[in-house]
Amino acid sequence: MTSVGDGWWRWDGPSTASESDGTPTASDLVLDYAFVLDGAEPPVPDPRSAWQPHGVHAPSRTFDPATLTWTDSDWRGPRAGQGVLGGIVYELHIGTFTARGTFAAAIERLDHLVDLGVDVVNVMPIAAFDGRWGWGYDGVGLYAVHDPYGGPAAFARFVDACHARGLGVCLDVVHNHLGASGNYLARFGPYFTTAHSTPWGPAVNLDQDHADHVRGFIIDNALRWLRDFHVDALRLDAVHELRDASPRHLLADLSDAVAALAEDLGRPLDLIAESDLNDVDMITPTAQGGRGMSAQWDDDIHHALHVTLTGESHGYYTDFAGGAGRDEAGPLAVLAKVLTCGFLHDGSHSSFRGRPWGQPVDTEHVDARRLLGYLQTHDQVGNRMTGDRISAVVPPGLQAAGAALYLLAPTTPMIFMGEEWGASTPWQYFTSFTDEALADAVRAGRRAEFASHGWSTADVHDPQNPATREASVLAWGEVDEAGHRRLLDWYRACIALRRRVIGVGPTRLADVRVDVDEAARTVVTLHAPAGRTASAVVLNLADDPADVPLLRSGGRVALAWDPEGTTLTTDAVRLPGGSAAVVLW
């Protein structure tokens, strides 16, 4: 290798070619290699390797994206070039979406997503990590595709298959830390700093000496997925842990770089942040001084829905139950605020954090599609002690009610895999680390975390037990069972109705009104944008039938969980207990 200055070294590949005309053969273009740094053994893999066929501790293998075969030359982006905002997002994990847990197997299930009405597939992290199975958030080869899933070529085929079916692809990427096993990045330079700390240890170095190279490493990684693998959007994990005191935040630089690439490619590219800051600066354009994210996950929507449906009020759910010194009398009042304001914590006190939290959303001018709403996510299911889904906690009618609220809201909806049919399989935390000391530490950490919430640790599953991952694999045979099929039909109908009443343009929370009755356990939301069809989602969360007053008279019932028990009068809907209906005007 040749030093080219500033700590960089260069190698241009084989010095001789195998063909008589000087053209390298295929064997010349695929080479295994590793680095010996300052004489230290053993050699370590390339931090920018695209391919780790023998695992994250083994040599890297060269991979040329120009060798990929694509059939998506006519692809204009999700929703015929509209992008992710406002579309139906579907979060899935390659390793548990199917029993085989590969990209090839996932392709076989894509038609189900098309039939459901999905627009964008949100793929959980695929960066190379230690072991066969895992959630993916312990990635260490950030440029490499996890080989047990199929490797880089298989991922390209998956993206191509999605595009062939009209599905966009959003890839979950983790830039706020690296996993503990196979993390050799610090040997290559000052990629981490003790000037800041994170839950995983020293922070990624974004603002100390030599940070420009680290920032470039992250931005190049993002652009590579979008450019070389034709990905349409990136979900950025826990961006609040990107500790950056620079004059300009990394996310703003990343946003501008992605915008420039989108212009070059001629198709929309979106960045979706996972952020618990409740800070609208995250979704404010960089030209206005913001960080330029297209959208952000909105956990407040999840928390409000979950507490409303389940009655749980421990931990970070406490404030979402209302009462006890809050302005909101109960969980339904909290739900009303979140559905009309975007956040519960918009500068108000957070008892979980012990201080005021968040900023208000300008409901007149901020595009509501920039907030993602959901009833379940991998985190909100998998970080429960038994990984139990909402379908294991509440009856189908209540899940249907919650689904109607977020699927027909002006925010961007996201479904977690299997949610649409009320999957009976849990989603549990699983690992397959080869380092037994690390595995023991993970086990102890999970037990301590659940004990801190007051739960008995006797029921905590072993993340390293292969049965834990196997239990989390979707049981696709359930789709055709009557009870599951009913819920699936409901989700499909809500999505189809959304296309009629929400449309494809910008939306406003200011167009939403909500009326609740805490005692009667009823909710009515009215979305009435000027010049468009008005829609109301009407819920009876109580056990007994109830007459639920509407916020305007007339209309017609377009959808009901229990059609035979649902009747519309001039200004009310009579609903059976634990059910929902949608009224249009």
Q: Where are the model-predicted features located?
A:
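Glycan-recognition and catalytic regions of carbohydrate-active enzymes
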Residues: 341-358, 415-430, 452, 456-535
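C-terminal beta-strand-rich structural cap/linker in extracellular carbohydrate-active enzymes
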Residues: 569-585
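Conserved alpha/beta catalytic core and glycan-binding cleft of carbohydrate-active enzymes
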Residues: 56-57, 251, 255-454
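The feature marks proteins involved in alpha-glucan
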Residues: 4-91, 98-101, 112, 437-438
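Core domains of carbohydrate- and sulfate-ester-processing enzymes
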Residues: 37-77, 165, 183-199, 316-319, ...
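Asparagine-centered strand-capping/turn motif at beta-strand->loop junctions
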Residues: 538-542
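Beta-strand-rich binding/interaction modules
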Residues: 1, 544-563
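Substrate-binding/active-site clefts of carbohydrate-active enzymes
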Residues: 76-84, 93-264, 270, 282
